[in-house]
Amino acid sequence: MVVQNNFLFIAFIFVTFMMLDAWQSESYDYKSLDKNHIIEKKNIENKNINKEVFSRENYITVITDLFILKINTYGGDIEEASLRTYLSNTKNNLPLKILDRSKNFIYKLKSGFITKNDHDINNLIHIPNFISDKKLYILEDNSDYLQVPLFYNGENGLKYVKNFIFKKNSFSLKINYSIKNTNKDKMEMMFFGQLEQSIKDQEINNGYNFNFHTYRGAAYSSDNNKYKKYDFSEISNDKNLNVITSNGWIAMLQQYFIVAWIPKIENKYKFYTKNIPKDEKVSIGFQSELFSIDQEEEKNIESTLWIGPKLQDKMYEVDANLGLTVDYGWLWFIAQPLLQLLKFIYKYINNWGISIIIITFMVRGIMFPLTKAQYTSMAKMRILQPKIIEIKNKFSNDKKRQSKEMMSLYKKQKVNPLGGCMPLIIQMPIFLALYYMLSGSVELRHAHFVLWINDLSSKDPYYILPIIMGITMFLIQKISPSSISDPVQKKIVSFMPLIFTIFFLWFPSGLVLYYIISNLVTIIQQYIIYKDLKKVGILI
C-alpha cells in the first residue's frame, strides 16, 4: 500500500531532482581525458617516483611528503604537480597528476610581473630565466618546512627572488616575491598570477560516475561573491570575467580536487578570465594595480596556493571562503553535519563502508516516528477507501459537494489526507543531502569497503550492489499491502525495482550501499509497524 505509492512518488521526486541538479551544476562536458587526471589516500614510497622527473635540464624537482612538483626555471612556474597520497586509479601505485604539461593536456600555473605596455599576459616577450642552487629539493623527515628559492637578475636592473615555501602535511604552499630595483630610474609594474587548462578532448569527470552533481570549471571569491562558479564554456565563448576586488581568490575545480590561488591583496586586484583559442585553453587569473619601485627600493609580494583535494576543514584554515568549493548544493546545511558525523564514526571504525551503514541506521532510526506516522495514515486511508469511492460516485457531478463530504469524512475519522505523503516529503531533503554528501566527498574516493568494492566513490565493477538493491526493493514491494486497483499503475509499480536497478548501475557504490541498508531498515520497520497496526485493528 504505502510502498507502491511511494515508489511512484520517489521516482518522480528523484528524477525531478536529478534534472534540476544537472541544470544547476553548470558542469561543462569534455571528452576523454586520461584518468590520471582524476585523483586517494595511500602512501607512495620514493622508489615509485619516476626517474624521468630528474631528466629535463630546465626543470627542478621538488619532493615533499604530499607533492612531487616540477618547476620550470624559464618563467619560474610550477608546470607539473602530482599528489603522493592520492592514486591515479586503484589498479596502479602511481600518484595522481593534477598539474601537467603533456602533449595532449596542459594544466599549469603562471605568475610574474608585467608593465603597462604588456597587453597580453599569454604572449609576453620578456620572460625571466631563473637560476636555482639545486636541481632537486626534498623535504626531509626531520624538517617541517622546505624553501625553494629562484633567482633572477634582469638587464633592466630588476632583481628578484621567487621563493616557494612548503609546509609538511599541507596542501597549501607560499609563493613569495622579493623585488629590488637597482636601476637609476623608478620602475612601474603589475603583479599577476594565472591558472591555465586545456579544454579540448578532456575527461576529468565524464564517465567516472553517473553523477550530475559534478562541476569542472573555474571559480572565484571576491568582495561581492563569497563563491562564484565561472564555467569553461563562458570563457571559451569570450564571456570574460572582469572583477575588481580587495580580497578573494581564483581557482579551477574538478569533482574532488582544486587548484586555488589566494593573493595577499594590499590594495585592489582585478580578477579576469581569458580564452586562449590558439592553444585550446582557458585561463583565470588576477592582476594587481600598477605600482612603482624607486631606485634601490625593495618590495615583497606574497600569495598562497592550494593544490589538492577538497578537504573542507583544511581549506577553511587557508581562506574563509575556500571551503565553499566543497559544494553540497542547496542542502549543504544538512549534508555538512552528516559528513561530520560520518567522519566521527570513521575515526573509530576505520572503514567508510561500515561508517555509511552505521549512519544509515542512525538516520533511519531518527526518522522512524515520521515513517510510522506515514504508514499509519496510509493504513487509515486504505480503510476509508470504500467510503471515499462511494462519495465520489454519489457526487460525481458536484465536485464542490464531493470535496466537502470527503473533508467531513476525514474530520470525523480523524484522518489527515496528506498524512501519508507529508512525512515522506520531510524525509526527502535528508535523502537528497546524503546523495550530495556521498557523491561529493573526497574521503570516499578509492575508499575500500569489502572484497571487490575498492572505491566507494565509483560504480560497482560487477554491478552486484545495484542487483542486491533491486532485490530489496522487490521484497519491500511483495510484503506491502496494495490498494492500487488501476491495472496500468499496478504494472508501472511492478517494474519499479527493475527500473531503479538499471538506474543505479552507474551510481557510486557508497550511495548504492546506503540505499541497500535503507531498504533493509524499511523491511524491518514495516514488520514492526504492520504488527502494531494489526494489534489496534487498523491494518487487516
Swiss-Prot record:
Pfam families linked: 60KD_IMP, YidC_periplas
Cross-referenced CDD domains: 5TM_YidC_Alb3 (cd20070), EcYidC-like_peri (cd19961)
Segments traversing the membrane: 1-21, 351-371, 418-438, 464-484, 497-517
Annotated function: Required for the insertion and/or proper folding and/or complex formation of integral membrane proteins into the membrane. Involved in integration of membrane proteins that insert both dependently and independently of the Sec translocase complex, as well as at least some lipoproteins. Aids folding of multispanning membrane proteins.
One GO CC annotation: plasma membrane
Family label: Belongs to the OXA1/ALB3/YidC family. Type 1 subfamily.
Assembly information from the UniProt record: Interacts with the Sec translocase complex via SecD. Specifically interacts with transmembrane segments of nascent integral membrane proteins during membrane integration.
InterPro entries: Membr_insert_YidC (IPR019998), Membr_insert_YidC_N (IPR028053), YidC/ALB3/OXA1/COX18 (IPR001708), YidC/Oxa/ALB_C (IPR028055), YidC_ALB_C (IPR047196), YidC_periplasmic_sf (IPR038221)
NCBIfam families given in the database record: PRK01318.1-3, yidC_nterm, yidC_oxa1_cterm
Keywords associated with the record: Cell membrane, Chaperone, Membrane, Protein transport, Transmembrane, Transmembrane helix, Transport
GO molecular function: membrane insertase activity
Primary localisation category: membrane
Subcellular location: Cell membrane
Listed GO biological process terms: protein insertion into membrane; protein transport
Membrane topology, record value: Multi-pass membrane protein
Domain of life, source organism: Bacteria
Record carries keyword Chaperone: yes
Keyword RNA-binding: no
Protein name per UniProt: Membrane protein insertase YidC
